[in-house]
Amino acid sequence: MGVTGNSDLYTDYLNNIGAAMKDASGNEIKDNIKGSQCWCPITNLDTADAAYEWNMGQYASTGTRASGTFTKTLSDDLTAKYVEYVNNIKLKNPSGNELTLTSTNAGTYYDYLKSVLEESLNNFLSDTTFPYTPSSSCGGAPSGSGAPSGSGSPPSIRHLETYDTADDYISSLNSDETWITKDSSTGNYTISSVEAFVKHCKTASKDVGAFDDLSKTQAENKLFGISYSTNTKHFDSIMANLLSDKSSTYSSLTNLDSSYSTEYTNDLSVTDHLGKTITERVNMYNPMYYLNSYYDGYESSDVADYFRINTGITQGDTSNVVEMNLFLALSNYGKNV
């Protein structure tokens, strides 16, 4: 709602449900708002599956990401597609420098994510009163229908012990390897890599196709369902294209259902009762569509002035970069975040 104010994409739907569109004087009623509180936003569904694999999936090797499975190769391909996407959207950091990726694990975009994770760690340590007893393990636990098959539980880094000092707490996180270090001159902590953070604190809790599940079992599949047809639909055009373009490669690997490609293609061709395509509806739901010049909808809505984005940085239901991209896009758009 904070980004889609007065968007024409919603007009047909509002008229269809009989929403008030004009006041008593015949003036158009506006629906833009002043500010938005965003808690763990599940957005950017056009690239959410690719973002999940780039941020988390590429560092996993069990379940649907096990070697020899077609879904492992699909994960790698989605990761590569996300690199392309990042370089297309040309986000800038707060200093005005463009963020790019030179590979799946390198580039200024990667470095910026790493710095965000480090900032969160240092803020947590400075804001927390020690002795400290965590309420849960760092990695959390898979939950819901999206829990990955065969992946097991993520590593329990904190054991619900009480830590007397910040250094004691960091020592527990470094119990199996040293991936967090302290700068003796500044007192700040840094992490060795995004991969280390993911493996210790943010393991993937969903299978490949984290949002547009191959079996159409995720809540997002229901979101794009067509009431008069079936209740769930595929919506990820990146996955649809990969399943079609790389069918010969995937067919040589395990766990491929030959119907996947056809199902994605068929679902993406369906329109709803107002003649809107799945892609149009994905755009409606995507803040980046309105905020970034890569998309046709750039500057087509009245965006709120103020935003606050809150999220659990270690939760495995979505990638860190969805929220990070939203922050950067809003900042690049001139909004207060």
Where are these regions (language model features)?
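Primarily recognizes the serine-hydrolase "nucleophile elbow" in alpha/beta-hydrolase
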Residues: 1-59, 138, 146
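Structured segments of extracytoplasmic/periplasmic soluble domains
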Residues: 4, 39, 124, 294, ...
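Short, surface-exposed, polar/charged, turn-prone segments marking secondary-structure boundaries
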Residues: 16-17, 63-68, 335-336
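Non-catalytic, alpha-helical, charged scaffold/linker segments
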Residues: 39-41, 47-226
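C-terminal subdomain of alpha/beta-hydrolase-fold enzymes, centered on the catalytic histidine
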Residues: 137-337
